[in-house]
Amino acid sequence: MPNSRPRPRRGAGGGAGAAGRDRLVARSLQSAEHCLGDQDFGTAYAHYLLVLSLAPELKDDVKETFQYTLFKWAEELHALSRIQDLLGCYEQALELFPDDEVICNSMGEHLFRMGFRDEAAGYFHKAVKLNPDFNDAKENFYRVANWLVERWHFIMLNDTRRNMVYNAAIQKAVCLGSRTVLDIGTGTGILSMFAKKAGAQSVYACELSKTMYELACDVVAANKMENGIKLLHMKSLDIEIPKHIPERLSLVVTETVDAGVFGEGIVESLIHAWEHLLLQPKTKEENGNCGKYGKVIPAGAVIFGMAVECAEIRRHHRVGAKDIAGIHLPTNVKFQSPAYTSVDTEETVEPYTTEKMSGIPGGYLPLTECFQIMKVDFNNLQELKSLATKKPHSLNVPAIKEGVLDAIMVWFVLQLDDEYSLSTSPSEETCWEQAVYPVQALEDYCIQPGDRVTMEASCHDCYLRIQGISILHLEHEMEVMKGFTKSKDLLSLGNEAELCSALANLQTSRPEALEQTCMLEPTEIALLNNIPYHEGFKTAMRKVLSSLAPELLWQPMDTHCQYMEMNSGSGQSDAAPSTADPFYVLDVSEGFSLLPILAGTLGHVKPYSSVEKDQHCIALDLIAEANHFPKETLEFWLRHIEDEAAVLQRPKSDKLWSIIILDVIEPSGLIQQELMEKAAISRCLLQSGGKIFPQYVLMFGMLVESQTLVEESAVQGTEHTLGLNIAPFINQFQVPIRVCLDLSSLPCVPLSQPVELLRLDLMTPYLNTSNKEVKVRVCRSGRVTAVPFWFHLCLDDEVRLDTSGEASHWKQAAVVLDNPIQVQAGEELVLSVEHHKSNVSIAVKP
């Protein structure tokens, strides 16, 4: 805390008034310091406000102490949920210090924490403008920029063909008389500007995102169209005539379609537009000026599908192994990903995931021909209204190849009018991804030519839903459903004895054997399928536990058998009597983790899991029971602590941990926030000889040339946007690091061998350096556009987990250069690597 007391300066006017003011200022300063000493931050803050209102000339003297007081008081207000008071304090502070980047950044952090991302971005952006070298503000701005301006904006604006086709369709409509235009979900305003350039008389554009609305205002003004385009910061559903728009319009243009067509609400917005904003549609019999009628671009969409085999989708949506590093997964625990929805579900979550299938690691195998799922006419109000209420229709598609049914892949042709169209097929060079409906909950996923894939398609809750996916197999001249559940199979049993026998086999007569569905994120399912990860942890944990009790070294025998032996009878082995203290193992990795159960198989261990969700706890208990754990061996750590924010603490007041497992890399490929701080606390909680896993982390990187990364990170000039000046404005939201990459399938040319860039040591922090320069030899001539990076998690010196490996559940990341560097084979470049508060930056020096 700053501890300097400024001396009040006498006002130039002198006299009794000035003297009284000085005395009040001095007393208030003294009171503020006393309150700070007593940690009464609210009262101290009030005293500083009084001082600065009476003596603004003291701003520079008390600035640091005032900041400290403000931040401490704001944390207390946040803990008390006094949000209005908190925001009021920051507004007062910014009136006093309007150009203080530290206060701006702190205000942004509070707003972001409260969910006001648009507003937070404004404060982070202002802080960076005030001080471009302020790392905390830069990192905060990069983080929020990914939320506010999603990366697909850059990809779509760089898609020249998409821009040309939309421009041509809009030009044609305007030339045919559609002179009053509304652009729904305008984004940067590009479609509105196409309409204005085509000669539209009145153009309106609406955008809900505050950030994108303000960006569109800047873009439209820069292109000198601010007088011809009226921008509205609102949803199209809230637009009223004549309040916002004077009269009904002849044309609506929109691109509010996602990979599954309907996911961005296009059906709802077009129903509202036809009912409240557009002129009546032109009938087939009517001719004449199009300006008298209403019309929508795009005019409609045709949706296609294909059944595919794809190992990458499979490993993210189905748990393939029945045994993971010696842990048996019982059949009564069913894992599912959020993309799974049953036929009778009423959930409104997005029922699909999205992938760029042309670049998915390992590729995919078509199992059926392409088939049409549905067709929709955006210029037909009755058809739009019936979409959400129409009953699901069945599809029955013959298989043409042998394989494993992993997903239904969906794409569409967007028919802008009767002449112009865009396809999102994986065989097209397009900015769109495909919608993927993973197949789950079948008894058998194998398919042969002649089998048939059946499913139901609907537009329930304005999402395209593909449900009830099954395989019909032609066998003995009968179609037998392979996807029958066990309960349906029971109905075919011939007599009561068989029924009883089947029930016994299914263990449905025992209440504790009831099935538990466990919903996991795709990365969590991929983690369960990552066998080297679990085997690596098992090996490393065994080494540590053996070193802590050498007299308990295991005999060379099967681990599972030994574990069964040591836990039979009294539940303890001869080598580990019940009076001995167990080894305490804490797993604080995020999400669902089997590591505590793995630890429990290694001897006299008390493992603690930090899973939060009830269904995850139940699933782990069932797995522990199936693996013959003594009751209450596995504990759930969050049930034992009062403050969930303080997860890292002793197992008991007089005990320490033998192993603490930390989550060090996010699934996106970045270092976890506050990693080194967590490691510092963890080191204080370890017994002598105890370890943090991983013990250290190595970061690797390489030089590459990748036009894909360039175009996904920033808009490239005006050529792609057909002469419109958009790039400088949206590129303010570009971030230097691209996350969630698959280096194995990224279109790129390696220009160097991988090199070690950084070491983060969690056990011996004095080995760490925050800055490092690394020389990299160029092995191939080209343009360096990016530096992809990944990590090796070193559980010890022998056991390493590679986040770029084939089985990895982690993605990778890359630093994308602002300006590519031309290099020749044999040259050396220097990479300047900086690690600051769990954020890594890489600069390339020629």
From Swiss-Prot:
Pfam families found in the cross-reference section: PrmA, PRMT_C
UniProt keyword annotations, A-Z: Cytoplasm, Methyltransferase, Repeat, S-adenosyl-L-methionine, TPR repeat, Transferase
Domain of life: Eukaryota
TPR repeat copies, ranges: 25-58, 67-100, 101-134
GO molecular function: protein-arginine N-methyltransferase activity; protein-arginine omega-N symmetric methyltransferase activity
SUPFAM superfamilies: S-adenosyl-L-methionine-dependent methyltransferases (SSF53335), TPR-like (SSF48452)
Localization: Cytoplasm
Predominant location: cytoplasm
CDD domains named in the record: AdoMet_MTases
Record-level GO BP terms: methylation; mRNA processing
Cellular component annotations (GO), alphabetically ordered: cytoplasm
EC number of this enzyme: 2.1.1.320
Catalysed reactions, as listed in the record: L-arginyl-[protein] + 2 S-adenosyl-L-methionine = N(omega),N(omega)'-dimethyl-L-arginyl-[protein] + 2 S-adenosyl-L-homocysteine + 2 H(+)
The UniProt record lists the keyword Repeat: yes
Positions of the SAM-dependent MTase PRMT-type domain: 137-466, 530-846
Disulfide bonds: none
Subunit structure: Found in a complex with PRMT9, SF3B2 and SF3B4. Interacts with SF3B2.
Family that this chain belongs to: Belongs to the class I-like SAM-binding methyltransferase superfamily. Protein arginine N-methyltransferase family.
Function: Arginine methyltransferase that can both catalyze the formation of omega-N monomethylarginine (MMA) and symmetrical dimethylarginine (sDMA). Specifically mediates the symmetrical dimethylation of SF3B2. Involved in the regulation of alternative splicing of pre-mRNA.
Protein name listed in UniProt: Protein arginine N-methyltransferase 9
Gene, per the UniProt record: Prmt9
